[in-house]
Amino acid sequence: MNAYQKTIGRAVTLSGVGIHGGAPASARLLPADADTGILFQRSDIKDSAPVCAHVSQIGATDLCTSLGAREARIDTVEHLMAAISALGIDNLVVEIEGPEVPILDGTSARFIEAVDSVGVVTQDAKRRFIRILKTVRVEAGNSWGEFRPYDGTRFEVEIDFECPLIGRQKFAHDVDEETFRKELSTARTFGFMKDVERLWAAGLALGASLDNSLVIGDDNSIVNADGLRFKDEFVRHKTLDAVGDLALAGLPFIGCFSSYRGGHRLNSEAVKALLSDETAFEIIEA
């Protein structure tokens, strides 16, 4: 457990396209002072106010996690937030050119590479953590998510698809920086060809391609020539998403998060439920 807050050594920029709109997008990561937190700002909108990376600022959870509202909304923050959280970075300003964080390769790997290229700086202020004190559970149909006390930071994510290629998969592991780098960071976002074609027809997912998505064909086979990176790559990516979504609690947590057939909306609802119950957690200093 890192005792002191961290930021990055210097600014670094990543460029690509937005997966939903298909337009050019870039993210410029800048160092920030201790106790700043993670701030997003639209650099393409004059006098745009910074938006705190916090669950209270979530604007939408359809297909991705979005922060802010209306014309200043920022979509698809989860892969970047997962990398930031896993690397133990507490303070950062993220300037976004366009309405989306670039999808890059559909994972967190490129964001980690960018941070590695500029280094991480330890700051004078102590880190704070959310320690889970009791179980908090949310349900939606046959899906559920819950926090419970645990001495560490653990994710237990289970998915269940009718598609035989995916089926029922579970990833259960304590997640620290090393685990995230090796087991989760390169797991790709995924989708079904029939859904991608439907989204394209509706003017959505215009930036989706085999370069940034794992695609399942109508015959339940992998369309990508390189196949799967892990036999359970699907649930690993869902866990990556959960790491990013739960980072919007505002502080790293000590406890276990479990989910069944979850997604961005369920993840955010679980965080909201936790933070709304003051008896369910305490803030501690490292």
Curated annotation (Swiss-Prot):
Entry GO CC: membrane
A GO molecular-function annotation: UDP-3-O-acyl-N-acetylglucosamine deacetylase activity
Gene3D superfamilies: lpxc deacetylase, domain 1, lpxc deacetylase, domain 2
Entry keyword annotation includes Isomerase: no
Reaction catalyzed: a UDP-3-O-[(3R)-3-hydroxyacyl]-N-acetyl-alpha-D-glucosamine + H2O = a UDP-3-O-[(3R)-3-hydroxyacyl]-alpha-D-glucosamine + acetate
Enzyme Commission no: 3.5.1.108
Residues that hold Zn(2+) according to the record: 79, 237, 241
Pathway: Glycolipid biosynthesis; lipid IV(A) biosynthesis; lipid IV(A) from (3R)-3-hydroxytetradecanoyl-[acyl-carrier-protein] and UDP-N-acetyl-alpha-D-glucosamine: step 2/6
Class of the enzyme per the UniProt entry, highest EC level: hydrolase
InterPro entries to which the protein is assigned, alphabetical: Ribosomal_Su5_D2-typ_SF (IPR020568), UDP-acyl_GlcNac_deAcase (IPR004463), UDP-acyl_GlcNac_deAcase_C (IPR011334), UDP-acyl_N-AcGlcN_deAcase_N (IPR015870)
Gene Ontology annotations of biological process type: lipid A biosynthetic process
Listed HAMAP family: LpxC
Protein family membership: Belongs to the LpxC family.
Annotated function: Catalyzes the hydrolysis of UDP-3-O-myristoyl-N-acetylglucosamine to form UDP-3-O-myristoylglucosamine and acetate, the committed step in lipid A biosynthesis.
Protein name, entry field: UDP-3-O-acyl-N-acetylglucosamine deacetylase
